Regions:
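Transmembrane beta-barrel domains of Gram-negative outer membranes and organellar outer membranes
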Residues: 1-195
Length: 195
């Protein structure tokens, strides 16, 4: 199976100090399998992120993200319901520009079926400075389905970021699945712009 998604766009808009609005644009997705091709838009989402605490001693920088999917996608790529998500994100700056971070979140979803289940997502990443403009990262993340028969999915990925200027960053990533039901290989490129 081959899958392609575009644009993977997330708009982050500062509302007031320590509060941002987050709007995820639906992706146009194509899935090619032997004998069948499906394409169309996925669901989008809307949410907010609240900054809870700055890094202080052993305490990391903390943020809480509350969001909900918007069921606007094609049937093959939509749950046809509003699926709420709550995520705790953390980051910790180490010496010499190194950093670690991660998140843990839970989503209530029906996966397009009749019964709702809880899906947890979790990640841990390390950031590595290479030059003033170039950085690298490596990340582990996973998905577990608490009240569903689906098996957990686990992934590793890494990539590079290039800071063109203070308002523009380019990135590239590549990763692979660690479990049988995970995607074998994936890659992507991105562009971050600050207005």
């Amino acid at each position: 199976m081959d899958q392609f998604e575009l644009p993977e766009a997330l708009f982050r808009i500062g509302l007031i100090e320590n509060l941002e609005l987050r709007i995820e644009v639906p992706n146009y997705t194509t899935v090619d399998t032997p004998g069948d091709n499906v394409d169309g838009f996925s669901d989008g989402s809307i949410g907010v992120k609240v900054h809870l605490a700055d890094q202080n001693g052993a305490l990391p920088d903390l943020g809480l993200i509350a969001s909900a999917s918007l069921p606007v996608g094609k049937e093959a790529f939509s749950s046809d319901n509003v699926d709420p998500t709550l995520t705790l994100a953390w980051a910790y700056d180490l010496d010499s520009g190194y950093s670690i971070g991660g998140n843990v979140g839970v989503t209530s979803s029906d996966g397009g079926g009749d019964d709702r289940f809880l899906e947890t997502a979790y990640s841990f990443a390390a950031g590595i400075p290479l030059t003033e403009s170039w950085s690298a990262y490596v990340e582990y993340y996973g998905l577990s389905f608490l009240s569903s028969d689906e098996d957990s999915e686990h992934y590793m990925n890494g990539g590079f970021t290039y800071l063109v200027n203070n308002n523009l960053q380019l990135d590239w990533r590549i990763g692979f699945g660690l479990t049988d039901n995970s995607d074998d290989l994936f890659t992507g490129a991105g562009l971050s712009v600050r207005f």
